[in-house]
UniProtKB/Swiss-Prot annotation:
Gene Ontology CC entries for this record: plasma membrane
Function statement: MFS-type transporter; part of the gene cluster that mediates the biosynthesis of heptelidic acid (HA), a sesquiterpene lactone that acts as an inhibitor of glyceraldehyde-3-phosphatedehydrogenase (GAPDH) and a growth inhibitor of the salt-tolerant lactic acid bacteria in soy sauce brewing. Might be required for efficient secretion of heptelidic acid.
Family membership: Belongs to the major facilitator superfamily.
Bilayer topology: Multi-pass membrane protein
Protein name, as recorded: MFS-type transporter hepF
Single GO term (MF): transmembrane transporter activity
CDD domains linked to this entry: MFS_Tpo1_MDR_like
Phenotypic consequence of gene deletion: Does not affect the biosynthesis of heptelidic acid.
A Pfam family assignment: MFS_1
Keywords assigned: Cell membrane, Membrane, Transmembrane, Transmembrane helix, Transport
Segments of skewed composition (Basic and acidic residues): 7-17
Membrane spanning stretches: 89-109, 124-144, 147-167, 179-199, 206-226, 276-296, 311-331, 357-377, 385-405, 416-436, 448-468
Keyword flag Transmembrane helix: yes
Length: 483
């Protein structure tokens, strides 16, 4: 059941749910084994490793693993003698489709077996599939391995928010989530630049060798320097140890059988289908994510064909989006937790909806950036103008994404991973499908009206964001989902 917002910042959050299952609880609110009571250093080591993992792996708003490869698509098509532009677009977007399915596995596994084992298994598999991408001998083989790389690369982005909920009380989560998202924010700026120069000088396969080296290193650090953070898993392990060392038969642990695992697998789907809040947020996110991926998959052709950039230099066209992401992330990190504390002092307690005022601004900001970008390219104005426009889009992106993730984590703290996974399904499908029509739309309408349509799409969904802010608490309490 959805955890009441007012209780989300107490160290015994998960304790009450464990007691209901007759599982051992924390030894007082100051129990040092409770991740909420760990030292700041231990908490931030986990945050740092997750942030670097999201930088290399995948998901929100053109992370490194998907954006770094975009500049190399032209060379890949030439090597494989592939003239079908739709198929070469799929090579980039299929990774995002994998991210739609991966969270449906990562979230329940993390909530059944723990965060640590989920990070470890998925990171190792992602590294293997990335190597397979690098040795692909035809485009079909590459598409298949890119899909599975997306599936297995989803763990840090799916359960990163859940890890933050494990480690931090509500009024501290905004800053922690900002750091977890930092890798995703800078990846659009660094990924394509690195990918462009790697492709130009060493070939497109070296993009995957670089990802393999970086992610392999991060996986080793994750195995060595992180530990389990999920309260249910920690308490279940404690109960299991106590059963072996005591005669108290009442000490039980939650065993994992097929029925329980299946129930965990369907939890994200239940949230998506039965929670109106979860569904509305996911639909809005699918549109925003799709719009961003239309831009990401067309930046390289725009700057190579319209502004005659080389493959290496064309990666610089992504800098605006990355810088805009960073500015938006900085604004959120500086204001969100302070606003939550102020609202708690004013009303007596903080609500998840107090994360959302910034999200209401996202639609107009994204639309303004799309108008700027599209008509600058259409008029062939100096290349700096579309880069500035994409930076405004990046700013609006963070205005939407950060409050959205924080809202889901605060609304479903115990099952934050499932809440984010439910959102990821629609959002990643939007990011995979909408770009397939992007180039054809630009060919038919031009960049001016093509991006104007995307801007109007961003504006159409803004009233829904206002409705969530005003009526979200009522909807959450009226339609609670038994999890």
């Amino acid at each position: 059941m959805e955890t009441p917002a007012g209780k989300a910042d107490r160290p015994r959050d998960h304790d009450s749910e464990q007691s209901q299952d007759n599982v051992v609880s924390w030894e007082g609110e100051d129990d040092p084994t409770n991740p909420l009571n760990w030292s700041p250093l231990a908490k931030w080591v986990h945050v740092a490793i997750i942030s670097i993992g999201t930088f290399t792996i995948a998901r929100e708003k053109s992370p490194l693993a998907s954006s770094i490869f975009a500049p190399g698509v032209v060379e890949l098509a030439h090597e494989f003698h592939e003239e079908n532009q739709l198929l070469t677009t799929i090579v980039v977007s299929i990774f995002v489709l994998g991210l739609a399915f991966g969270p449906l596995l990562a979230a329940p596994i993390s909530e059944m077996y723990g965060r640590w084992i989920c990070y470890t298994v998925f990171n190792i598999l992602y590294t293997i599939f990335t190597v397979a991408c690098g040795v692909s001998t035809n485009i079909s083989m590459l598409i298949v391995f890119r899909f599975f790389a997306g599936v297995t690369g989803s763990a840090p982005l799916t359960i990163g928010g859940g890890t933050v909920a494990d480690l931090f009380p509500m009024h501290q989560r905004g800053l922690a989530l900002s750091f977890v998202t930092l890798g995703q924010a800078v990846a659009p700026a660094i990924g394509p630049v690195a990918g462009g120069f790697l492709t130009q000088n060493l070939g497109w396969r070296w993009v995957f060798w670089l990802l393999t080296i970086v992610n392999g290193t991060i996986t080793i650090c994750q195995i060595l320097f992180t530990r389990e953070t999920y309260a249910m898993t920690i308490l279940n392990r404690r109960a299991k140890r106590l059963r072996k060392t005591t005669v108290h038969s009442s000490v039980t642990h939650r065993s994992v059988n097929f029925a329980i695992f299946f129930y965990s697998l369907v939890r994200p789907c239940k949230l998506l289908l039965l929670s109106p809040i979860s569904l509305i947020v996911a639909l809005c996110c699918a549109v925003i994510y799709g719009i961003l991926y239309v831009l990401v998959t067309t930046f390289s052709p725009v700057f190579q064909d319209t502004y005659h950039f080389s493959i290496g230099i064309s990666g610089l066209g992504y800098l605006g989006l990355g810088i805009g992401n960073l500015v938006g992330l900085w604004i959120f990190s500086m204001t969100s937790d302070r606003y939550m504390v102020a609202q708690a002092n004013r009303f007596g307690s903080a609500k998840p909806e107090h994360r959302l005022p910034m999200m209401i601004l996202s639609g107009p900001v994204i639309a303004a950036g799309l108008f700027w970008y599209g008509w600058s390219v259409q008029a062939r104005i100096h290349w700096m103008m579309p880069i500035v426009g994409s930076g405004i889009v990046g700013l609006g992106n963070m205005f939407f994404f950060m409050p959205m993730v924080s809202y889901l984590v605060d609304s479903f703290p115990t099952y934050a991973a499932s809440a984010i996974a439910a959102n990821a399904v629609l959002r990643s499908i939007g990011g995979a499908v909408l770009p397939l029509a992007g180039q054809r739309m630009y060919d038919t309408l031009g960049f001016g009206w093509g991006n104007s349509i995307l801007a109007f799409m961003a504006l159409v969904f803004n009233p829904l964001l206002i409705a969530i802010y005003r009526y979200g608490e009522y909807i959450r309490t009226r339609w609670q989902v038994k999890l």
